[in-house]
Amino acid sequence: MTDNATILQHVPVGKKVGIAFSGGLDTSAALLWMKQKGAEPYAYTANLGQPDEDDYDAIPKKAEQYGAVKARLIDCRLQLALEGIAAIQCGAFHISTGGVPYFNTTPLGRAVTGTMLVTAMKEDDVNIWGDGSTYKGNDIERFYRYGLLTNPNLKIYKPWLDQNFIDELGGRAEMSQFLIDNGFDYKMSKEKAYSTDSNMLGATHEAKDLEYLNAGIKIRDPIIGVAFWKEEVEIKPEEVTVRFEEGVPVALNGQRFDNPVELILEANRIGGRHGLGMSDQIENRIIEAKSRGIYEAPGMALLHIAYERLVTGIHNEDTIEQYRINGLRLGRLLYQGRWFDSQALMLRETAQRWVAKAITGEVTLELRRGNDYTIMNTESPNLTYEAERLTMEKGDSMFTPMDRIGQLTMRNLDITDTRAKLGIYTDAGLLSIGQGSAVPQLDNKKK
């Protein structure tokens, strides 16, 4: 490995090394191990509003106990909320099953963490970064991209890519014993049947038992929502009104929120009471291998449903089509760790300017269990939907029966062309005409 290598495979002795520190077993053992091997560890913890984290202030103190030269808590919640709203505005969600999307909550969290922690490291003149991502997953590439995008001089050192670390502390039991042997009363928590990663926007559950497709959502304990599949869990129908102004969610049930963080947390509470936004997805990782995840995102789901209702009531068909196509492409870029790449910024600007700016109004929904809901009302000064335009009742109309006759007559041109093409395909043996064919009602007579 040359001195110019970006990825370091051995402990950088005598060098400052920043580590994304969660306070869990892996990063605690890694920090102490690096310290003992001669590195100068600096710990950086991102406050992403994780629903399963009770005491953020205690995490940097723990890092210092394990040997961190300096430990900092970086509040990333506002930036994460803004990026989440941007994803809603752009429809940046490319993974879905049965119409229920995955809201890319982990990729959004990585975009914020990767840039904000490396920025904090630069302030401390720390130019080597490590995190807990494994070589088989998506995060190792996401953090790599965002880290180098933020600091072009950054070097990467991950203990989990260092064979010496793997040989000495290759598993949870070894890491726990290592901490105990060094005087830390670390009690290894009981392993769950799956792994969970979360932030304010949502939670991801994957790996272990969830790698097997015969293990479903029911083995998992929700951390944002409720187990709506359990009959004993009482969930009463609830109406909720969501208000947008120029594409930005500003109010829930008439209560305005100046802080987007507070709005998303309240949306989580409302949607979470019903288990809204939970999904089970099979997806393609960046390396093209398939993986399976179960996701929670009640607040994102609530905002997405209301936003798309206004989109369909305000914009024309071609704009909606382009919004959806661009959203699929942008969602994939986000998933790949390219949220701040030029091609992503181009797609984001298009949606946020020409789609989102027109989205002002209120949508009222009735939430029931899981993703079962009904849209009760839609109001907006910008609606192009007008019931009177296509009313089935007798009255004034914007066009007459004769107008429609003329419009239909013009269709004769392309119908004739289509019929001719089908004849060509039939003659070429690509189509068969008659019973059981793709076009059974057509004959092969040319008229």
UniProtKB/Swiss-Prot annotation:
Q: Which organism is it from?
A: Acinetobacter baumannii (strain ATCC 17978 / DSM 105126 / CIP 53.77 / LMG 1025 / NCDC KC755 / 5377)
- Source domain of life is Bacteria
Q: Where does ATP bind?
A: A20, F21, S22, G23, G24, L25, D26, T27, S28, A46, G132, T134, D139, D197
Pfam families per the record? Arginosuc_syn_C (PF20979), Arginosuc_synth (PF00764)
Query: Which family, according to the similarity comment?
Result: Belongs to the argininosuccinate synthase family. Type 2 subfamily.
Q: Which of UniProt's keywords are assigned here?
A: Amino-acid biosynthesis, Arginine biosynthesis, ATP-binding, Cytoplasm, Ligase, Nucleotide-binding
Please give the pathway this protein is involved in.
Amino-acid biosynthesis; L-arginine biosynthesis; L-arginine from L-ornithine and carbamoyl phosphate: step 2/3
**GO BP field:** argininosuccinate metabolic process; L-arginine biosynthetic process; urea cycle
Q: Does the keyword Secreted apply?
A: no
A Gene Ontology molecular function term for this protein is:
argininosuccinate synthase activity
Where it sits in the cell: the answer is:
Cytoplasm
**The protein, known as:** Argininosuccinate synthase
Q: How does it assemble?
A: Homotetramer.
Nucleotide-binding as a keyword? yes
Q: What is its main location?
A: cytoplasm
Q: Which reaction does it catalyse?
A: L-citrulline + L-aspartate + ATP = 2-(N(omega)-L-arginino)succinate + AMP + diphosphate + H(+)
Q: Which GO terms describe its cellular component?
A: cytoplasm
Which residues does the record give as L-aspartate binding sites?
A: T134, N138, D139
Binding sites annotated in the UniProt record for L-citrulline: Y102, N138, R142, S195, T204, E206, E283
